[in-house]
A protein has these predicted regions:
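Conserved catalytic/binding loops enriched for acidic/polar residues
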Residues: 92-451
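Metzincin-family zinc-dependent endopeptidase catalytic domain
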Residues: 1-83, 87, 111-112, 122-125, ...
Length: 451
């Protein structure tokens, strides 16, 4: 059998790789790598949001061949790793600090990830001016974990092979550069093993990505004046900003809430099998998510950007009315159990909900009416509590025709204290609909007589 690298005339935008193996021995007999026709589409869509602020080559629809080749090199490194028997290692990108990833000397020597088998491509922790200093901006070489893994798999051993391999592995016990990160199970999320993450500081990562997206919102309309640029690319461009915010920004950082570091058990290892993310870190992440997503007015500040996608009055309202970021935060609530159980000083579900409520009602506690973004977040919060609580589900079924609506707006002189504990009797009507992009102005709740 022969190894092949094929040009694929399809609409895929990712390099593919698979091996033909002997099922009896596991021996790799052949490797097949496919390079898609539309690789440039992926570079154009993904690279611009993370790199345009840092690298001027991304500030155009017409991506230079040089940039495409750099991207292809990065993707082929992983493909070659797969052909040699290496598995996807989602922890590689979490091994280094933001300071290391902004160092020209460090990145030129070690690259931007400890393993190219991760799914990271770009060094989005870099800042404007770092490229000129020599900071590496894209995966360009195998990481230290890759080198060790190839040694482990293929190096000849003159002594007892099993003992030698165990010795080699234990020499790197506890070193994050050599940690192999599998995809986390749903009930135990390891924040080191996330798609699209980079660096070991989630706060710095979030700040960097938001700064890059803000730059794109402010400047991108000037990049697309050419009439030859396809309309569908122009029209979908703002939508990809939302995808960037939700999938590549909010999802990785929220995994620290209820997160737990999982290390495979080894009787000789000094690393615990389970190590919950500290309560302090979880609190910091929650506060950072609220402070970042509380005010998304910058998404609406450039009308030319909004008009790329047609007649859009704003984008922030769409995000809020579709439940972000609260939907992601309540998703994490259901996955805090193992972290709480294994921690000596846990960040409990009750403490988490209390902290969320402090953020939700910060305006009210300061004597101000709830803003439209907070009303939208409150709606998702109440709806989630009702869906998770059997008691509230029963109440909802019994009194579905007697749900009372209260308008929460600046004209209503309300006192939220009269609602009592929202975690006990709040609900959002399952049939309530918000029209178009209009800000949410009301939320339904149970009155005392309902309970």
């Amino acid at each position: 059998m022969i190894n092949t690298i094929a040009f694929l005339n399809n609409n895929n935008s990712e390099v593919t790789a698979y091996n033909v193996t002997d099922l009896r021995t596991g021996e790799i007999l052949s490797s097949k790598i496919g390079v898609p026709r539309d690789l440039a589409v992926s570079v154009r869509r993904n690279g611009v949001y993370q790199m345009a602020e840092i690298d001027p080559r991304f500030r155009t629809y017409y991506i230079a061949d040089e940039v495409i080749c750099e991207n292809l090199t990065a993707r082929m490194l992983k493909a070659f790793g797969l052909s040699l028997g290496l598995a996807t290692n989602l922890a590689g990108s979490a091994a280094y600090s933001p300071e290391e990833l902004r160092s020209p000397e460090f990145t030129q020597k070690y690259g931007i990830t400890a393993s190219v088998m991760d799914n990271v491509l770009y060094n989005y922790l870099a800042q404007p001016g770092d490229k000129e200093k020599g900071v590496v901006l894209i995966v360009d070489k195998p990481g230290v974990c890759d080198a060790f893994t190839l040694k482990y798999l293929y190096a000849a051993t003159s002594e007892n092979e099993s003992d030698t391999l165990k010795k080699w592995a234990m020499e790197h016990d506890g070193d994050p550069r050599y940690f192999y990160g599998k995809r986390s199970p749903a009930y135990a999320t390891d924040p080191r093993c996330q798609n699209y993450d980079l660096g070991n500081d989630p706060i710095a990562s979030l700040d960097a990505q938001i700064a890059h997206v803000k730059y794109v919102v402010k400047n991108s309309p000037a990049w697309f004046h050419d009439d030859n640029i396809p309309n569908d690319y122009r029209e979908l461009f703002p939508d990809f900003v939302i995808i960037e915010l939700i999938n590549k920004t909010l999802s990785p950082v929220s995994s620290y809430i209820g997160g737990i570091y999982i290390n495979e058990a080894n009787e000789k290892s000094n690393v615990p099998s389970y190590q919950p993310v500290s309560a302090d870190m979880q609190k910091k992440v929650l506060q950072k998510i609220f402070s970042t997503f509380y005010d998304l007015s910058w998404l609406d500040s450039n009308k030319d950007f909004l008009r790329l996608g047609g007649v859009n009055p704003d984008m922030s309202t769409w995000i809020y009315n579709n439940g972000y970021p609260m939907m992601s935060l309540m998703f994490r609530l259901m996955r805090m159990g193992l972290s709480v159980e294994k921690s000596t000083r846990p960040y409990t579900q009750e403490a988490y909900l209390n902290d969320i409520e402090k953020q939700l009602f910060k305006e009210t506690l300061n004597g101000k009416p709830l803003s439209a973004p907070m009303i939208a977040q409150l709606s998702v919060y109440i709806s989630s509590l009702k869906g998770m609580c059997p008691t509230l589900k029963a109440i909802d079924k019994a009194v579905s025709t007697r749900v009372t609506s209260i308008a929460l707006n600046e004209q209503t002189n309300h006192k939220l204290q009269s609602l009592g504990l929202l975690t006990t009797f709040a609900s959002i009507s399952a049939t309530e609909k918000q029209s178009g992009m209009e800000p949410m102005t009301s939320v339904n709740f149970y009155s005392g007589t309902d309970i």
